[in-house]
């Protein structure tokens, strides 16, 4: 078997195992929606809710909104804006996390129907603006009165921010019947999560993934929401992108997902009975990072005294999570010594390559030794070309005499695939790489592609001229040629396509990938080139003994 065929076989085997890995990861570790089972269905959304969106006519609502006032609040981590119209939170920006325009990331966007990040259907009963009261630096009240079925109610929304800089807002809903002798005619209401975390243009699509996914966590399971799915007593429900999310938690809540105007929303049912309302919602709005999310698993770690909320389960974990955890720790150690995440990726790559060097050494040495047998192998192929059985016997005899395993170069490569996938997942999703600069003016954000020129529009498939993909392609091509142990002139046309096609193919695949991933790839290629020189010297010394 020729060397090019062996390499091609290794590529096919690699692709096969990549496919198997993706299937396993998709089946066991992706967050798919469960089927709507009897256990999960606990209510009928339209039947149980008697307050709809038509309580106030459109013109009246528009006039009310036009006369409302905005209330600006600044905390250690948020820029928040409230409106006296419905007492809504209409803007929530993260002070410490900037977008590509170097502005605070917006977590709330009010849509054309004036729906905010979240809203309460009780708002539809109000016919007056809310009054505002600043209780203290962290607590803000919005209050109004309204009439329903001939009875008068006092309606209060109380927002409380953390005094410890946590990405959590406590929202308390109070509804009191002003006539204490009367029972309430409002037996339930909806809390609707309809978040729209800031998305970027095509240029930054890989930074934010430009999509929202709804999720719910219940019975120790994380699932994506879908139209018609209802869940009893989940720990939380929320929406998220690649790096940010909004999660809502409340005791004894029931949730149903429903499609409205092509938008999937999460409806939280709150049954009241004939009593006054006093409900508390905890709303996490911030980075999708366990360092922030896990603070709410122990009451002594957060200012709200929350425990076992399990917000951290919203962070997707792959099949190779157990490998990614030590890798992340190593990156963090390097960053603590040299505060540059780009260098941390390079050092991590070198450490990983050193650790798996015995495998790669065996693979490259087997390939190098096998290439030395090419003249003898060709003689056997010519001599027994009409006798396949004898050909295989003689080839096997040659391998045994020379002490060479023809598959010795394949299996070590396959064993390295889990490490590659783990590194890819870590570099591609690690929150701290977002906005992290490596080389200012060139690689300003490791979570997106590098750029030396931005077109302002799409040219073919691209929006930017990038340098790292070209460096990656050249270094991979050099690495492939050096590893082949075959002169360029001796390659046939198909072999040349094989050798040059892979680097070019990866160039197009990885062109818009995060620069942190390309730094890993380039470092790997350079390490492989240096490693191959060492292996060639080692093989040469062995043959001279």
Curated annotation (Swiss-Prot):
- GO biological process, alphabetically ordered: protein insertion into membrane; protein transport
Question: Which compartments is it annotated to reside in?
Answer: Cell inner membrane
Give the transmembrane region(s): 10-30, 319-339, 341-361, 407-427, 467-487, 502-522
Tell me, what is one Gene Ontology molecular-function annotation carried by this entry? membrane insertase activity
For this chain, the annotated S-S bridges are: none
- Membrane topology value: Multi-pass membrane protein
The principal location of this protein is membrane
Q: Which PANTHER family match?
A: CYTOCHROME C OXIDASE ASSEMBLY PROTEIN COX18, MITOCHONDRIAL, OXA1
Its quaternary organisation is: Interacts with the Sec translocase complex via SecD. Specifically interacts with transmembrane segments of nascent integral membrane proteins during membrane integration.
HAMAP family found in the cross-reference section: YidC_type1
Q: Name the chain's protein.
A: Membrane protein insertase YidC
Q: Name its species.
A: Borrelia hermsii (strain HS1 / DAH)
What taxonomic classification does the UniProt entry list for its organism?
Answer: Bacteria, Pseudomonadati, Spirochaetota, Spirochaetia, Spirochaetales
């Amino acid at each position: 078997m020729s060397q090019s065929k062996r390499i091609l076989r290794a590529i096919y085997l690699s692709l096969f195992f990549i496919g198997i890995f993706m299937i396993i990861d998709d089946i066991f570790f992706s967050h798919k929606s469960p089927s709507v089972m009897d256990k999960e269905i606990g209510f009928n959304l339209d039947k149980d809710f008697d307050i709809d969106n038509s309580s106030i006519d459109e013109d009246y609502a528009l006039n009310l909104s036009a006369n409302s006032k905005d209330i600006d609040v600044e905390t250690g981590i948020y820029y928040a804006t409230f409106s006296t119209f419905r007492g809504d939170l209409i803007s929530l920006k993260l002070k410490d996390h900037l977008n590509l325009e170097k502005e605070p990331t917006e977590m709330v966007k009010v849509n054309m129907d004036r729906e905010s990040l979240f809203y309460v259907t009780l708002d539809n009963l109000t016919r007056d603006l809310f009054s505002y009261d600043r209780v203290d630096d962290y607590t803000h009240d919005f209050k109004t009165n309204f009439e329903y079925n001939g009875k008068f109610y006092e309606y209060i929304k109380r927002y409380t921010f953390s005094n410890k800089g946590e990405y959590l807002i406590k929202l308390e809903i109070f509804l009191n019947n002003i006539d204490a002798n009367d029972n309430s005619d409002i037996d339930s209401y909806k809390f609707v999560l309809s978040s729209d975390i800031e998305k970027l243009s095509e240029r930054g699509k890989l930074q934010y993934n430009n999509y929202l996914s709804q999720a719910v966590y219940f019975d120790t399971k994380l699932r994506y929401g879908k139209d018609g799915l209802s869940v009893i007593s989940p720990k939380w429900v929320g929406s998220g992108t690649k790096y940010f999310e909004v999660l809502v938690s409340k005791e004894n809540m029931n949730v149903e997902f429903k499609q409205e105007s092509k938008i999937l929303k999460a409806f939280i049912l709150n049954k009241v009975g004939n009593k006054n309302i006093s409900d508390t919602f905890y709303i996490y709005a911030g980075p999708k990072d366990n360092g922030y999310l896990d603070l709410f698993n122990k009451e002594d770690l957060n200012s709200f005294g929350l425990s076992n909320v399990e917000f951290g389960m919203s962070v997707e974990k792959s099949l190779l999570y157990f490998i990614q955890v030590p890798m992340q720790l190593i990156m963090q150690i390097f960053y603590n010594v040299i505060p540059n995440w780009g260098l941390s990726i390079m050092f991590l790559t070198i450490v990983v390559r050193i650790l798996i060097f015995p495998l790669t050494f065996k693979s490259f040495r087997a390939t190098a030794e096998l290439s030395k047998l090419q003249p003898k192998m060709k003689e056997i192929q010519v001599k027994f070309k009409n006798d396949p059985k004898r050909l295989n016997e003689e080839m096997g005899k040659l391998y045994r005499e020379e002490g060479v395993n023809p598959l010795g170069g394949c299996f070590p490569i396959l064993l390295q695939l889990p490490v590659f996938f783990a590194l890819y997942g870590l570099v591609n999703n690690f929150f701290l790489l977002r906005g992290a600069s490596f080389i200012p003016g060139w690689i300003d954000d490791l979570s997106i592609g590098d750029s030396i020129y931005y077109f302002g529009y799409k040219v073919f498939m691209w929006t930017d001229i990038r340098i790292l993909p070209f460096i990656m392609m050249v270094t991979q091509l050099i690495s492939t040629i050096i590893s082949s142990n075959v002169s360029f002139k001796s390659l046939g046309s198909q072999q040349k396509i094989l050798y040059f096609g892979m680097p070019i193919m990866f160039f197009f695949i990885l062109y818009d990938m995060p620069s942190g991933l390309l730094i890993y790839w380039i470092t790997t290629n350079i390490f492989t080139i240096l490693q191959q020189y060492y292996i060639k010297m080692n093989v040469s010394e062995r043959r001279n003994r």
